[in-house]
Amino acid sequence: MKLEGKTAVITGAGRGIGRAIALSLAKEGANIVVAARSVGEIEAVAEEVRALGRQAIAVPVDVRSKAQVQAMADAAFEKFGSVEILVNNSGVGVHNAIPKITEDDWDLTIDVNLKGTFLCTQAFFEHMCNNRQGHIVNVISRSAKVGLAKLGAYAASKFGALGFTQTTDQEGIAFGVKATAVLPGAVDTKGRADNHDDPDHSALLQPEDVADYVTFILTRPDRVYIAESSIGAQFLKPAPTNSIALKDGI
């Protein structure tokens, strides 16, 4: 197991991608801090981690609150002593055309997706630098690269999170601390279902696909540097733009 003896803090870990990441990292030997607002969900995930033979604590947190984020960090340090991995996975998406974006929806999206990433990173970054090891993975979105219609607040938050990830990585280089941005495409989650009417959910990425990807990144040798990486759903690939007809599928 490549993460034996390490501790990972995962936000948004009560369900979906965060839960899948928690279980995947536990299978590689990591102890897990399961963090999210939903107490019942994170307690259930913590039990799943323990069933895999790893230690886990469930910590309720609203990543918009500096005090709650610091309390999460304090709980992690008290239980495990050190934290080597942080996965910033909390996120929200309220999709509307620009004239219909409310100030409350804008603030919620920016506060969770961008401010939350900042606060959680800040809570662990100095600790990692002092220990001369650490890896921060920010699960962002492919919307960090393309601002599509009705994704104004969402894209703005994700573009910002990508830039912040790059800064985190640059500041961590001298201390052996890495930061990686993971940009998933369409994933079959509750958040996706709330905003999209997908006729075929089997065509979407599954949370486990993203979790496997994050685990791959976190288990590379120290010499490997992955600053940013995308993973997409096959059905969203753009159609070929050339006009050459292919015969017999070749």
What residue ranges belong to the model's regions?
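Conserved glycine-rich Rossmann-like NAD(P)H-binding loop of the short-chain dehydrogenase/reductase
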Residues: 28-44
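The beta1-alpha1 cofactor-binding region of Rossmann-like NAD(H)/NADP(H)-dependent oxidoreductases
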Residues: 39-40, 60-72, 103
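Conserved glycine-rich cofactor-binding loop
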Residues: 7, 14-16
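Active-site helix of classical SDR
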Residues: 121, 157
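C-terminal helical subdomain
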Residues: 174-177, 181-182, 189, 197-239
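Residue(s) in the substrate-gating loop at a strand-loop-helix junction
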Residues: 141
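Substrate-binding pocket helix/loop in short-chain dehydrogenase/reductase
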Residues: 97-98, 105-110
